[in-house]
Regions:
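PRPP-associated nucleotide enzymes
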Residues: 1-160
Length: 160
């Protein structure tokens, strides 16, 4: 991992990042929040609370490499039913846009189901993104650091 500078965030830091995004996020209407596991669950709940959105859904996506084509293909372990997304505006929330694969895959799956989406992440790493033509719609900060969020402190302490 090239991001060697570990930065440990406090809950107050997370609150500041969410607060920074809220004016832009609030300028759109959403019917639901889709939090990407695991990192997006807590910021997704915080944002949903601030927007007074009752529908908070989970998207769990993993990637497996196709050895023949050397491509990563998303495997959705958990995802809302297409019929629930059709015609709806969703806000996708994750903690960080590193390579961008998770957010982009979730957005494409929502679009395929007939829904619309915007995305919000606490941190954006444009230098690591695999997508030159895509980025999060909203982000709290741009970083090159390895971010350790308050809900994953043990992970940072153990060096995982």
């Amino acid at each position: 991992m090239s991001d060697t500078n570990k930065v440990y965030l406090s809950w107050a830091d997370v609150d500041q990042l969410v607060s920074k995004m809220m004016p832009q996020i609030q300028s759109y209407d959403y019917e639901l929040v889709i939090a990407i596991t695991r990192g997006g669950i807590i910021p997704g709940a915080i944002i949903a609370e601030r927007l007074a959105i009752q529908q908070v859904l989970i998207a769990s996506v993993d990637f497996y490499e196709d050895e023949e084509h050397d491509l990563d293909w998303p495997v959705f372990m958990q995802f809302p039913a297409d019929s629930f997304l059709r015609g709806k505006q969703a806000l996708i929330v994750d903690d960080i846009w590193d390579r961008g694969k998770q957010v982009v895959s979730v957005a494409e799956r929502i679009r395929y189901a007939g829904g619309r989406s915007l995305s919000a992440v606490l941190h954006y790493k444009p230098h690591r993104s695999q997508f030159s033509d895509k980025s999060p719609d909203f982000y709290g900060a741009i970083t090159k650091d390895w971010i350790i969020y308050p809900w994953e402190v043990e992970r940072g302490v153990l060096g995982i």
